[in-house]
């Protein structure tokens, strides 16, 4: 996950304002438990195609090339986890029958390490759950990120050699390390 937020808080407020103006399709709820603050419910909103580009600045934190995001944005489902602010967003595509892939997931930097990403992944797994279905996620070779996905029930699947070198127009870095190969993890649903 990249740090820094291009466009800052005002862009997030535009996206949040949009969330409350849209005619919402599927809405789900998750319960978040915070130490010392008890439990509370947060809404998960499925974003229609007409609103997806409003979240581009957040998507660019996790996948910093617009042309790569454009390849999957409108062929996937986008979900936002929110309460009074957007906490996390996710784009999931169907790659073939019963095979889904998280193409982009980002927790807003100031809300990271509070369980929002895990709750969103848990919701996504339940949303696409059917016997035989599989959920994939691809990421760079960052031990912190790999550990996060393993905690979410994923296991290593395969590697696409030189993915970041062959598909991005500039070097990609994660925690100071240049990304070369795409590591795929899978979770049986």
Give names to the regions the model predicted.
Residues 20, 26-50, 183, 189:
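Conserved N-terminal entry element of GNAT/NAT acetyltransferase domains
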Residues 40-68:
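Short amphipathic alpha-helix that is part of the acyltransferase structural core
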Residues 80, 85-94, 98-106:
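Conserved beta-strand in the GNAT
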Residues 105-112, 140:
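A short, internal acetyl-CoA/4′-phosphopantetheine-binding micro-motif in the GNAT/acyltransferase core
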Residues 111, 115-123:
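Conserved acetyl-CoA pyrophosphate-binding loop and the N-cap/start of the following alpha-helix
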Residues 118, 141-172:
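Conserved active-site alpha-helix within GNAT-family acetyltransferase domains
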Residues 128-140:
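Conserved GNAT acetyl-CoA-binding A-motif
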């Amino acid at each position: 996950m990249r740090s820094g937020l291009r466009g800052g808080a005002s862009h997030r407020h535009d996206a949040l304002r949009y969330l409350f103006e849209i005619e919402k399709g599927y809405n789900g709820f998750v319960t978040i438990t915070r130490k010392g603050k008890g439990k509370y419910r947060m809404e998960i909103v499925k974003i229609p195609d007409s609103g997806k580009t409003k979240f581009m600045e957040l998507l660019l934190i996790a996948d910093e090339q617009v042309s790569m995001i454009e390849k999957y944005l409108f062929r996937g489902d986008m979900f936002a986890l929110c309460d009074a602010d957007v906490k996390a967003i996710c784009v999931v595509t169907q790659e073939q029958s019963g095979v889904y892939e998280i193409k982009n997931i980002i927790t807003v930097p100031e809300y990271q390490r509070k369980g929002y990403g895990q709750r969103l992944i848990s919701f996504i797994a339940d949303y696409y759950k059917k016997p035989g279905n599989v959920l994939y996620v691809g990421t760079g070779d960052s031990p912190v990120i790999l550990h996060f996905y393993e905690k979410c029930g994923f296991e290593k699947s395969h590697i696409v050699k030189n993915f970041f070198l062959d598909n991005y127009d500039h070097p990609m870095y994660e925690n100071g390390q240049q990304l070369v190969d795409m590591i795929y993890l899978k979770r049986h649903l």
